[in-house]
Amino acid sequence: EDFHFYERFERGSAGLAGAYGEPVFEVWLHDWSVSQVDEGIYHLQSRQGEDWLDLELSDIQGRVLQGQAGYSPKGPDVGNASYYISQPRLETNGSLMYAGEQFAVSGWAWMDHEFSTSALAGGQVGWDWFALHLSDGSELMVYTLRRQDGSLDPYSSGTYITPDGVEFSLNSGDFEIEVDDTWRSPHSDGVYPASWTLNVPAVDLELIIKPHVANQELTLSFIYWEGAVHVNGTRDGSDLAGHGYVELTGYAHSMQNQF
């Protein structure tokens, strides 16, 4: 299995890149684009060389306002916060062209939109973020903010969404994450977590999370790890599985003062 990643920058002029919110949502950068087809339905297209991706995504659950009605504090100061909106359950169908072969693809996607004035507070060096689709129809998003002394910041938080769509906000004391294994990057020499046990005692949720591919490090403008994971565990004593995405920053270098 291979992991591929790309990065582009462009000025928002001459039609090269841009975004609209009305009358419908659209954002594009050259031939990478996401456009709204109808209420809750989006068309995603991207091309890199001879490879391309063409997907239709349908929001079957609706938006989730993370944190305090969409306001997500990341530290004690007023500026250390973000506005954070998710669409965690997007039914996805489409086509993928890779190495000259076309594939039909389907599954579930998760869209996050987060924007802020500052990513980290003083003393914070990075974050670990998890977004998981579970086989019982529930979803889990949690993130931990790591401090220079190795401790977890109390502003770490998350959201658990039941199979019937009820949302539960999680504070830092509501979940536990233990690193079970690590992986050292041959490119950056950063040492990343590579397996986790994640527990949410309030909903009797116990999960084991492992990457699909060990090397999902992105060596771009910022060096960090972000990639696909698979999940096994239990809720209320019943077995479940799942898939998701994990983002790990601050392991190759501190993210402090990077934004």
What are the residue ranges of the model-derived segments?
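Targeting-peptide/extracellular-domain and disordered-appendage signature
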Residues: E1-F259
